[in-house]
């Protein structure tokens, strides 16, 4: 017998999904989530510092971590509290680089088959030989119409999940390690971020008291909370080559999450930006343009979809590199690309793709899927009209990514101007927004 419950957040993809699985020889009547597990797997290495994962694992249980780190690198990246729990509770610790295995097989970032095979080898719900046979039969039935090549790639992924597992030697000295697994929010974040967003994102929303929502009884939430989330879930993301870039800004135009942005600076401004903010003379802005140009990526907001690389017409201007290599650039993005004082209003216009991308996006860092095409249009619309927009949102993907409280991607500028977003689930959306439009002159008179 088997039972499955699933726990997940509001994000369309790359959010957290917890699969609570029970297996037994007798009917299972439990009506609650698993809180003490024999086996726990973490499929994204960044979750270790975002969620309380390891404490739900029983002593002598098995822990599987999908990560790009080698065994001798684990102590550099895994918080001391987690390693101490593993050592103190005699946990059987395994690692696998499922992303590397799936990419080598031509499956891109689809590592589910690799990780499923690894689960059956470690959990031993049924003999691993039987599990492998069943999985390969399922592959043939599921992907048979897609051709022999796709079938063979997925069969190879099953074998990779069995063979690529590495058992980690748990060191006794880990029992003496310290270091909090979940990092506290920065000291300068607003109270709503500290008291509401952070607990909800850590799957602790049920612990919040009613008093935490004082002042928001009518359901309104402040704009722009998504900028504080900094999910950091992309394992690989683009790095900009200043010598190859032709400064067309297509990458920024096509980015679904506003995570890559062009910046223009004058000579005086270049003296005050952080070290490492390298620029080149701006192109296409006139012969005597005083500006220098840089395309800046936000490592913690990028989802690694690769749309920017596909859109880029200049070979080599953008290449993919590891998240670890790009982490230091977050400061450059936050202090310069997000700083409205560096916006050049004399350059911004709606006459070309290039120039409109120098405008502030009033829709950023949403919970949309990696590579989403819909948010690209919303972001562009916000760059054109964002400081004076009323938005009535019909139910669907766009409402989930736009109003999934407390993460709101619509934001306001330094003058307090920005889109006003509303969503009414049970009303005709055209009628709903038209009445808002009709009522506005009356409210202002």
Predicted regions and their residues:
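Active-site cofactor/cluster-binding pocket
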Residues: 1-200, 270, 274-275
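Iron-sulfur cluster-binding cysteine motifs and their immediate structural context
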Residues: 224-226, 250-269, 298, 303-325, ...
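Short acidic, glycine/serine/threonine-rich loops at helix termini
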Residues: 14-17, 52-53, 74-78, 105-108, ...
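Residue-level detector of conserved catalytic or cofactor/ligand-binding positions
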Residues: 436-442
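Intrinsic disorder at enzyme termini
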Residues: 172-229, 233-238
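Mobile "lid/hinge" segments at catalytic clefts and subdomain interfaces of large enzymes
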Residues: 132-136, 140, 403-436
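N-terminal amphipathic, basic-rich helices that act as targeting or association modules
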Residues: 363-395, 399, 403-405
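Ferredoxin-type iron-sulfur electron-transfer modules in oxidoreductases and energy-metabolism complexes
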Residues: 114, 127-141, 218-237, 262-295, ...
